[in-house]
C-alpha cells in the first residue's frame, strides 16, 4: 500500500497527517473536551479494502468510500455532547449517534442520512440535529428534510437558511455558536 500511495506516506513523514488511533487502538484526544470518536479501525479497514479492490466499486453503505469513513469528532458540552461527522455513512456513526445529544447530519443533511438517524434516535426526541450546508437541496439540507424532521418533533438547525444559533440551555453547561464561518 505504501508503494502505491507513497505521496500519502511522505505527507505523514512531514507531520501533516496524524493517526487518529493510539497504539492501543483507542482514539486520540485533540484537546480537553474534544476527541476523535470514529470511525472504528475495523470500519476504516473495511472501507480501505473496498476502495483498493477495483472489482467492488467505490461505494459502501450508500456512500463513496472516501466519504464513508470520515473522521468523527465529539465535543463535550458538560452534560451533553455534540457529534460532528462530515460525510460519514450512517453505519459508521450509528454507535456514536446513540451517545450524543446534538448530531450533525452527515453529508450536508442528506435526506436518507437524516431519516436513518431519526430511526436510530426514535426514542430520543430531545436530540438536536445540525445541518451544515451552504449549497441547498442538491447536496442536502432540503426543505423536505426540515419539514419531515420537524413534523416528527425533531429540532433541526440549518446553517444555510437560519441565522447563527447559539446552542445553550439549562441542559448544556457550555455554549457554542453554530453557523457558517467563511
At which residue positions do the language-model features occur?
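Short, low-complexity, polar/charged sequence segments that are solvent-exposed and flexible
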Residues: 53-57, 103, 122-125, 148-152
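Core dinuclear metal-dependent hydrolase active-site scaffold
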Residues: 21-102, 110, 167-182
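A short acidic, amphipathic alpha-helical/loop segment
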Residues: 7, 92-96, 114-122, 142-148
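Binuclear metal-ion centers of metallo-dependent hydrolases, dominated by the metallo-beta-lactamase
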Residues: 1-43, 65-67, 125-182
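Active-site neighborhood of phospho(di)ester-bond hydrolases with catalytic His/Asp-centered motifs
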Residues: 1, 82-88, 99-112, 128-135, ...
Amino acid at each position: 500500500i505504501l508503494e502505491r500511495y507513497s505521496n500519502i506516506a511522505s505527507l505523514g513523514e512531514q507531520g501533516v497527517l496524524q493517526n487518529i488511533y493510539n497504539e492501543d487502538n483507542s482514539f486520540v484526544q485533540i484537546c480537553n473536551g474534544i476527541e476523535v470518536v470514529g470511525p472504528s479501525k475495523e470500519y476504516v479497514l473495511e472501507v480501505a479494502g473496498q476502495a483498493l479492490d477495483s472489482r467492488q466499486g467505490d461505494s459502501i453503505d450508500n456512500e463513496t468510500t472516501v466519504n464513508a469513513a470520515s473522521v468523527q469528532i465529539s465535543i463535550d458540552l458538560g452534560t451533553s455532547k455534540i457529534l460532528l461527522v462530515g460525510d460519514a455513512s450512517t453505519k459508521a456513526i450509528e454507535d456514536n449517534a446513540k451517545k450524543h445529544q446534538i448530531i450533525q447530519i452527515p453529508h450536508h443533511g442528506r435526506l436518507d442520512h437524516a431519516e436513518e438517524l431519526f430511526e436510530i434516535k426514535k426514542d430520543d426526541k430531545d436530540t438536536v440535529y445540525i445541518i451544515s450546508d451552504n449549497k441547498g437541496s442538491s447536496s442536502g439540507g432540503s426543505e423536505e428534510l426540515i419539514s419531515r424532521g420537524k413534523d416528527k418533533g425533531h429540532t433541526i438547525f440549518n446553517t444555510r437558511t437560519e441565522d447563527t444559533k447559539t446552542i445553550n440551555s439549562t441542559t448544556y453547561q457550555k455554549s457554542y455558536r453554530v453557523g457558517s464561518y467563511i
